[in-house]
Amino acid sequence: MWLTYSPDGCTVYLTPGISYYGPPAHACQYCGAQFWHQERVKRSYSGEGGCIRFHLCCRGGKVVLPFQRDPPQFLAGLLDPHDDVLSKYFIKSIRSYNSMFAFTLLGAKIDTGINKEPGPYVFKINGQVHHRIGSLLPDEGKPPVYAQLYIFDTENEIQNRMSIFDRDRECDKDNGVDKKIVEGLVRMFDESNELVKSFRAARDLLGGSQVQPLRLRLLHDRSKEAPQYSAPAGSEIAGLIVGDFSEDKKSPDVIIQDRGGGLRRISNLHANYMALQYPILFPYGEQGFKLGIKYNRSGTLRVGVRGEVTMLEYYAFRLQQRRYEATTLIRGGRLFQQYIVDAYASVEENRLRYIVKNNKI
């Protein structure tokens, strides 16, 4: 038996068999997110002017963020399951391909046993999640990994990236990887991804001279004078530091050493936190959540005392499906599941951080 509701939401029926609500036939009047009728604000079915309202996406127009751009043509073809056989293999192994191009290491205890039983794929973690990044160059005698692959031994970059498939236990070895896809992704990121361009600039400087030491600074935030929602340029994402440098321990920027230093954790409040871990989902190196995103104050919208978008509100907006927004995220399959779990873990950590900081006991 299934519970179903009348169109006005007031009457409940017990219906035998399968319940089918059809496609999401409603859209938020502010951001265009698509919803089912049952997801509306309950008191709005006969609200002002008969307008049905939804708050799960943008809090009634308070949260305004840039829509995702259409992905580069190569990635768009790979994410289309009806395109060709190659795209189907890509979607099955999408987490493996993402691991090959990720700048950071995902630190989490992943429960692999849950998928040994029949049923749909589930991405489950236990405990805390964090992203870590190493040096620009590998230690002597060790192969390059993660961000180092954009800088070290790039003449053999394809081979180096595919060798990760054999070393990384998180790679889906049942489906394999295709060299043509890896080559295409390398070209695509070189042309489109601002983070990749910053690391390539470090490569060129390291390869063209013996200047030491060299560091790459990943900027936590853009200039306060920059338009809030404009696309970031490379100079707003990262900067190269040549010579001696005294690091400010209080700075939220991430300073990547040329060699050594071990793995360094990146704060989930850093604007590039997700783009560094999920280049497949953010092919242009788009910035993510950061502190200080203001609520929309246009029109008659009432804004509370806080006045800023929370991390939960940011991800609630980002995860919606909209008719006029690119579907790169929601076409990500298993990688999209991982991103959602990662985002929720960040939200929970941020809540705990607030409790600890504001504990008056």
Task: Give names to the regions the model predicted.
Residues 1-361:
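Non-catalytic interaction regions
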